[in-house]
């Protein structure tokens, strides 16, 4: 008799995706981040669900309801901090996952890569709307500043911003709709992630060498299930260390002050995971130019497959490209640091140079390096 996992219509899908899936024998820990993102997503949905049971999306009570969750709800504080710091973990895993894709040339799986870019944008939108919900000072002013950027769009800009706000400023209508979207989007993300996985399983995983691994496959279970469980345990350990010892390390102190439209905080800045994009936005003195640079800084990922010039897929045997890749990582860390600094000398010029470097590396230097490496290898 055939095993139930191979014959049952539902179990068959699970079996082909997580049990009998043929996987390359040499994929490293950099391939763990996909499953870690799944763990993060489930964690965020569960903690978010319990927070939504006690949260009220009204401007007069939102801040108090979050304080109530932390003070009066059983284990409310741990649920709240797991959700807030879980978002940071989510983005650490996301950036590592994207970085892995860039380094090992995983972007040549076009459908998988483009759905991944869509996922990144959706997660960023979800995180932004979630940051507005506690209705602290940074929540309010962050929402005001970021939504206001859309007013740079010619002709329809102002109407678009007022349509998103649901009025003439960020107010009750804005908070209510942001809560509604923040609640629904994770489920949409789950659906898109399933499509992401579907397309990945059409081609099979890439591996560190970037060459076909058809000659040497191993079953996903038990090898990679064990590996993924270890990764998940380490992720949860890191998260719980953050939650239990320094829960406010990555937050902004201004968010412990209730939102006040009459008092602007001295330094308006987003959460740490958006600082690199914020630095690029601020480095251009023109509003529309800044908005376009901000959008392009993320959308540039969709162009990566078109910019691949090397005859080799992975960077593992390409020292020139490796140098440029790690320069890009250093550049992104520099931008993240600059995004959190005030707009004054020398931070302005550092931010502008780092922004130019970011686009130069991706659009010019890395494709050039690929061509040079081909020439050096007489290909």
From Swiss-Prot:
Q: Which UniProt keywords apply?
A: Electron transport, Heme, Iron, Membrane, Metal-binding, Mitochondrion, Mitochondrion inner membrane, Respiratory chain, Transmembrane, Transmembrane helix, Transport, Ubiquinone
In terms of one coarse class, where is the protein primarily found? mitochondrion
Query: GO annotations under biological process?
Result: mitochondrial electron transport, ubiquinol to cytochrome c
Q: Which positions in this protein are listed as binding heme b b566?
A: 97, 196
Task: Select a single GO molecular function from the record's annotations and give it.
Answer: metal ion binding
Has keyword Membrane? yes
- Similarity annotation: Belongs to the cytochrome b family.
Write down what this protein is called. Answer: Cytochrome b
Name the lineage. Eukaryota, Metazoa, Chordata, Craniata, Vertebrata
């Amino acid at each position: 008799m055939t095993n139930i996992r191979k014959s049952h219509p539902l179990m068959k899908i699970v079996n082909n995706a997580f049990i009998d899936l043929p996987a390359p024998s040499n994929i490293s820990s950099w391939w763990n981040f996909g499953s870690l993102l799944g763990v993060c997503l489930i964690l965020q949905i569960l903690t978010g669900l319990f927070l939504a049971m006690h949260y009220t999306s009204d401007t007069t009570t939102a801040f108090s309801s979050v304080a109530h969750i932390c003070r009066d709800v059983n284990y409310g504080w741990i649920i709240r901090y797991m959700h807030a710091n879980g978002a940071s973990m989510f983005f650490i895993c996301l950036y590592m996952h994207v970085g892995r894709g860039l380094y090992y040339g995983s972007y040549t799986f076009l459908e998988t890569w483009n759905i991944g870019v869509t996922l990144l944008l959706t997660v960023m939108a979800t995180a932004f709307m979630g940051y507005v919900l506690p209705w602290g000072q940074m929540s309010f002013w962050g929402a005001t500043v970021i939504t206001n950027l859309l007013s740079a769009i010619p002709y329809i800009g102002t109407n678009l911003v007022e349509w998103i706000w649901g009025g003439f400023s960020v107010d009750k209508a804005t908070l209510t709709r942001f809560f509604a979207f923040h609640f629904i989007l994770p489920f949409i993300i789950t659906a898109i992630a399933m499509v992401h996985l579907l397309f990945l399983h059409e081609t099979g995983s890439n591996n560190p060498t970037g060459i076909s691994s058809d000659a040497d496959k191993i079953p996903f279970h038990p090898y990679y299930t064990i590996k993924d469980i270890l990764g998940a345990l380490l992720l949860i350990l890191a998260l719980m260390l953050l939650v239990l010892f320094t829960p406010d390390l990555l937050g902004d102190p201004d968010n412990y002050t209730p939102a006040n439209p009459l008092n602007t905080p001295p330094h308006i800045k987003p959460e740490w995971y958006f600082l690199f994009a914020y630095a690029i936005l601020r480095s251009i003195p023109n509003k529309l130019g800044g908005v376009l640079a901000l959008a392009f800084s993320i959308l540039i990922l969709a162009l990566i497959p078109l910019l691949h010039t090397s005859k080799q897929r992975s960077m593992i045997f390409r020292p020139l490209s490796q140098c440029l890749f790690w320069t890009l990582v250093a550049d992104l860390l520099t931008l993240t640091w600059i995004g959190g600094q005030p707009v004054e000398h020398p931070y302005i010029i550092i931010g502008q140079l780092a922004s130019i470097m970011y686009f130069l590396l991706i659009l010019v230097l890395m494709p050039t390096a690929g061509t040079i490496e081909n020439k050096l290898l007489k290909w």
